């Protein structure tokens, strides 16, 4: 799944905290950086005695999906919808509408535990921005 290693490290931004990112990026050699990256994912492997790391696979599958479905002005993983999808996975429900007199489109994504995200396309070109909640600052566990 990982084609560009440096990009794969940058894409950790939604699951790695600042200290973890600093630790990986402070490696002196590419081999050391690769080892630290692998250790990061080994700690999150739900079945460490198998060859497959389901957490790693799921995370980068979500990034691929985000790039294919939410890209536009930037890569899908960098968009607000991409970020929410990568962190929380597929929403239980997506409500789409145009309640505004100016024709702006909204999408409301609903997840379990009454968690909702509201996106509005202010430009009319599919560039949906997260408006509620305004900040997703926690490092969430994957919603599997």
Positions of the model-derived regions?
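Residues within mature, well-folded domains
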Residues: 1-144
